[in-house]
Amino acid sequence: MSGGLRSGIGGLIPHHVGNETLVKLWDTASKRAGKADPAERRANRAAFRNHVDRIRESRGLIEDQPCYGDMRYGSVSMAYAGCEIIAVFNALSFLTGKMPRLDRLIEAFGKDGVSFKGRFGTAPLAAVRFLRRLGFSAEPVFLREDMEALAASCRALILVYYNDGDDIGAMVHTIFISKENGRLTAHNAGMGGMAGPRARDLAELIGKLAGGNAREIMLIGIEKRS
């Protein structure tokens, strides 16, 4: 995308639409009812089985979204638009120690969250609703200072960010972040199937995402309710 477009049309949303406003608009444009096609459900279930061994090798976490072109989400593939669902999958796996069924998550977000038939992925607030229905505490925040405070106190996080804070045309990505021994690790962040990058705090981690061009939109802190 040209520099002129980056600073003009491409920069309009990142520079002039607030994070919380953007997320709420995204949610309004997303689906909250629907019935999954039985044949698609069966195909996704069969396809997921082919990924299970590789997920187990990655500590129960999905790090390789581009490999999921065999699973459908709306009118597109999980390789194209599955990052929000994969972030939820990784959060559940990390917090419970049990691998969830990705095909069932696809079905759930197809009923509440899928945006423009999957072409815009999943509305992040649908992830908040889903996690709360499962009994987790899920707190969304939109300002950098609130995000840094949340990241300091929470061991499981979902981050939504612009791949380029000056260009909406570079799209948005969503990742799970784990915290162990005081260090943050990003998952499914485009590291060639590996976990990472890693950092001491959220600001440092964001600075390492998307070639240093990332800009935060929303952070969800997830905890088990006592």
PLM regions: where:
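Non-catalytic, solvent-exposed segments at the cell envelope interface
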Residues: 72-78, 127, 131, 206-210
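A structural signal for well-ordered alpha-helical scaffolds and beta->alpha junctions
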Residues: 85, 120-124, 199, 213
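Noncatalytic regulatory segments and standalone regulatory/sensor domains
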Residues: 11-15, 21-27, 178-226
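Mid-length scaffold segments of soluble, non-membrane domains
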Residues: 114-140
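Active-site-adjacent substructure of cysteine-protease-like catalytic cores
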Residues: 139-186
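Stable alpha-helical elements in mature extracytoplasmic
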Residues: 84-87, 123-127, 143, 147
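Active-site-adjacent structural segments surrounding the nucleophilic cysteine of cysteine proteases
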Residues: 1-116
